[in-house]
Amino acid sequence: MSVATIRAPSSAVTSFVVASRYMPVYLALILLVIVASIWAPAALGSVGLSAIAPYGALLGITALGQMLVIMTGGIDLSVPGTLTMAAVLMVGVSQQSDGRIGVAILTAIGVSALIGLVNGILIGGLKLNALIVTLAVGQVALGAVNRYGRTISVQSPVPTGWSTWVSTRIFGVSPIFWIGAVLTLLLIVAFRYTTVGRRFQAVGANPVASRVVGLRVNLNQIAAYVVAAVLYAIAGLALAGLLRIPGVNSGMPYLLGPIAAVVIGGASLTGGLASPLSTFAAAIFLYGLNHVMRVMGLPTSLQFVVFGLVIIGGMLVSGDRIIKVVERVFRERRRSRRIENETIESSIDGTG
């Protein structure tokens, strides 16, 4: 006589373990709302949320691009150069004419995609170090922006139609937020329901095995940098509309923020696993945290300290670390159940 071994459904366990790596960012968002409602209620007012939505979404769109690169096991430090290039091209190509907005958008996206292609070929094709390559390409882009900036007036604004549209509200929220939400949804659908998306994740998680089964790892890396650069361009164009007169250093604040959002969002820095939704949520959280600290009147020095500690804390409780903790819990539970079942079986056999 035997007793069936009790096991949790493997699919349910796997789903819970994977989902747990993304849980901390949502808990952090809830905690931020609670803290703000107590010590900085003005941050949650209509004016405060109107400030968080567009700039948080800007960081989110940029973080989505960085996420794609990190999923391939790389990193992209050319973000400020690419983003600034797109913003300045909106000014230079449009020449303050609403009729040239479309041409300016296509030009900015095209040039940015070219920057991403250069990154992808050097890293995916020639196997150069991603950190060094993207840093160098970003510097080249910033140099080109400075040179191009001399050909247009320093005080030239973007077309009125563009700045007006970016500053409008759709269902009470900035259109930049809706753009970020749509891009996030598209990536979720791609990863879950398309062959290309599933292969992209598989290649990032295990490039060696992917090569063995015939997947084109190099092409995967190149595509990641190109799509990421297009997302940076979208963020740069939106930033130009918000600033109205973008400068040659407009993209500099977006060097480390997107990386922090990806990390806090639970992505695996070794490649493969990442969630577009948690990455976008992490970006909203980071900008919201900055906004709340400003409303609370914290000194700038203390804001830097808090921001840094939050990033470190996010790395400690999200991603691979929390996965190991959850797996350890399930392992101990399975072990205790196995011992219990063996004990029951032994007692039954003994009485038989």
Summary of predicted features, one role per range:
Residues 232, 242-308:
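Transmembrane alpha-helical segments in multi-pass inner-membrane proteins
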Residues 22-27, 52, 60, 81-82, ...:
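Hydrophobic alpha-helical transmembrane segments
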Residues 130-193, 220-223, 242-251, 295, ...:
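Transmembrane helix-bundle core of multi-pass membrane transporters
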